[in-house]
């Protein structure tokens, strides 16, 4: 579980981990927002019956940093950019595994190995080479 800088500072105290609802394990109740986020905001002037959208939802300056982040991440542009970055990351990850696979001796040489098999075989092979150098 990754901690935000705010949570990391409080994580030294075991009792503080359970005092914040967001730090509890399981589902995060604030991910989708809460009912209070959608309640009308009191207007400073007027009778409060304006009916405009601005009156129904909090002004962006009134939102917490976390809520602003959630709203930004909910946009199609952000999701598309994130998907592109993730696709590039996964492709680089798979290329690195393919390069490592080429360096490992197996019988037959073209045998398909899973990623965990590649890692375990690499560990054994490096250990073997280390042993050969020590002798």
From Swiss-Prot:
Localization per Swiss-Prot or TrEMBL:
Nucleus
Residue spans with biased composition (Basic residues)? 68-80
The UniProt entry's coiled-coil ranges are: none
> Single GO molecular-function term?
RNA polymerase II cis-regulatory region sequence-specific DNA binding
Keyword Repeat part of the UniProt annotation: no
Q: Which residues form the bHLH domain?
A: 77-129
Supply the alphabetized keyword list: Activator, Developmental protein, Differentiation, DNA-binding, Hypogonadotropic hypogonadism, Nucleus, Transcription, Transcription regulation
Q: What is the effect of changing residue 31 to M?
A: In HH27; uncertain significance; the patient also carries KISS1 and PROKR2 variants
Major localization class = nucleus
* InterPro entries in the cross-refs: bHLH_dom (IPR011598), HLH_DNA-bd_sf (IPR036638), TAL-like (IPR040238)
Q: What is the effect of changing residue 9 to L?
A: Found in a patient with features of hypogonadotropic hypogonadism and Kabuki syndrome also carrying a KMT2D variant; uncertain significance; reduced transactivation activity on KISS1 promoter; requires 2 nucleotide substitutions
A GO BP term here is: male gonad development
SUPFAM superfamilies to which the protein is assigned, alphabetical: HLH, helix-loop-helix DNA-binding domain (SSF47459)
Pfam families assigned: HLH (PF00010)
Task: One GO cellular component term, please give it.
Answer: chromatin
Compositional bias annotation for Basic and acidic residues: 10-21
Span list, region Disordered:
1-80
Q: What PROSITE patterns does the record point to? A: BHLH (PS50888)
Outline what the protein does.
Answer: Transcription factor which binds the E box motif 5'-CA[TC][AG]TG-3'. Involved in regulating energy expenditure, body mass, voluntary physical activity, mating behavior and reproductive longevity, acting through the hypothalamic-pituitary-gonadal axis. Acts as a transcriptional activator of target genes, including NDN, PCSK1, MC4R. Is also a transcriptional activator of KISS1. May act centrally to regulate function of both white and brown adipose tissue.
| Assembly behavior | Homodimer. Interacts and may form heterodimers with STAT3.
Q: Which disease is it linked to?
A: Hypogonadotropic hypogonadism 27 without anosmia: A form of hypogonadotropic hypogonadism, a group of disorders characterized by absent or incomplete sexual maturation by the age of 18 years, in conjunction with low levels of circulating gonadotropins and testosterone, and no other abnormalities of the hypothalamic-pituitary axis. In some cases, it is associated with non-reproductive phenotypes, such as anosmia, cleft palate, and sensorineural hearing loss. Anosmia or hyposmia is related to the absence or hypoplasia of the olfactory bulbs and tracts.
Q: What is this protein called?
A: Helix-loop-helix protein 2
- Species lineage: Eukaryota, Metazoa, Chordata, Craniata, Vertebrata
**Name of the coding gene:** NHLH2
